Amino acid sequence: MKTVTMKVTGLVQGVGFRWTTQMIAQDLGITGTVKNNPDGSVSIVAQGEELPLEHFIKKIKASPSVAGHVDHVDLNTVSDAEKFTRFSVVY
């Protein structure tokens, strides 16, 4: 099990980005959270097996929302993360 954090910038708020991120995560068996940040970016904590997590990251970088676009993803691996049981949108 691997955990990563992502800070996603671009047109990622107000375009269904969090909802589509949640749908992709659920389809791939990824757990964690996604939330909007005050600076217009989106933060994601994603946890899962190596291959599904790689697919998830690729889909995020390609922008899961057709109305939005991703300019940059700051990706970090977390070694001591809490265990998530589902993927949820944090409001």
UniProtKB/Swiss-Prot annotation:
Q: Which UniProt keywords apply?
A: Hydrolase
Looking at the record's lineage, which domain of life comes first?
Bacteria
In Swiss-Prot or TrEMBL terms, this protein is called: Acylphosphatase
- Which SUPFAM superfamilies is this protein grouped with? Acylphosphatase/BLUF domain-like
Q: Where is the active site?
A: 18, 36
Q: Hydrolase: is it a keyword of this entry?
A: yes
Q: What is the lineage of its organism?
A: Bacteria, Bacillati, Bacillota, Bacilli, Lactobacillales
Gene Ontology MF annotations: acylphosphatase activity
User: What InterPro entries does the database record attribute to this sequence?
Assistant: Acylphosphatase (IPR020456), Acylphosphatase-like_dom (IPR001792), Acylphosphatase-like_dom_sf (IPR036046), Acylphosphatase_CS (IPR017968)
Which reactions fall under this protein's catalytic activity?
Answer: an acyl phosphate + H2O = a carboxylate + phosphate + H(+)
What PANTHER family does the record point to?
A: ACYLPHOSPHATASE (PTHR47268:SF4)
E.C. no: 3.6.1.7
Coiled coil region boundaries: none
Ranges where the Acylphosphatase-like domain occurs: 3-91
- Similarity remark: Belongs to the acylphosphatase family.
**A Pfam family matched in the record:** Acylphosphatase
Top EC class per UniProt? hydrolase
